[in-house]
Design a protein with these regions (language model features):
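Polar low-complexity intrinsically disordered regions
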Residues: 13-31, 165-172
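Non-membrane alpha-helical secondary structure
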Residues: 45, 49, 119-122
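Short, solvent-exposed aromatic-acidic interface loops
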Residues: 19-48, 113-114
Length: 172
């Protein structure tokens, strides 16, 4: 069974504002501030997606939330990746909220099924706590999730096939 997850990118000023006013920070409370709601169908648990996000954020230390959102989608895209207007439109177990801007970047992980925050750490703290011996994407070397995906398609264009009249079963 897939551990579905969704990643939101929010400007850090909203984290600071909610913290200062002692308001709960949940995916629901951050919905209107999110630059992207990226759903991934597989491996949403902290030991995988938490580490993937932490590694990616260390390799892409941008502060502008719009730029982070765009690059995140580009680098994490694979066949089971979808974008939604609202994080509540799709059933998923974990929501990751990436807070970027002035100050340290933070990753908040929220378990939708238990309605609880799992953690709110810097990328390095996520790596320290959840890193395991897995084959993570090497974002620091310029790799992306789509680079690692095995796909029967090499482009969106139909493949041109030449049929040999003498041997119609040979499509070389």
């Amino acid at each position: 069974m897939a551990t579905r997850n969704l990643t939101m990118v929010v400007d850090r000023k909203h984290y600071e504002d909610f913290t200062e006013r002692m308001m709960d920070i949940t995916p629901y409370s951050m919905t209107e501030y999110s630059k992207v709601n990226m759903y991934l169908h597989h491996d949403g648990y902290p030991e995988w997606q938490g580490i993937q996000l932490a590694n990616w954020l260390q390799a892409n230390p941008f502060q502008d939330s719009s730029r982070v959102a765009a690059k995140l989608v580009h680098d994490h895209y694979y066949d089971s990746c979808y974008l939604y207007n609202n994080p509540n439109q799709i059933d998923h177990q974990y929501t990751y909220i990436v807070f970027v801007g002035d100050g340290e970047t933070l990753i908040l992980c929220y378990n939708q099924y238990s309605n609880r925050e799992v953690f709110c750490y810097t990328p390095q703290e996520v790596l320290n706590k959840y890193m395991e011996d897995m084959d993570y994407t090497n974002f620091a070397a310029g790799k992306t999730r789509s680079d690692e995906q095995i796909s029967p398609y090499t482009s969106d264009k139909p493949k041109h096939i030449t049929i040999d009249k003498n041997n119609p079963f040979n499509t070389d």
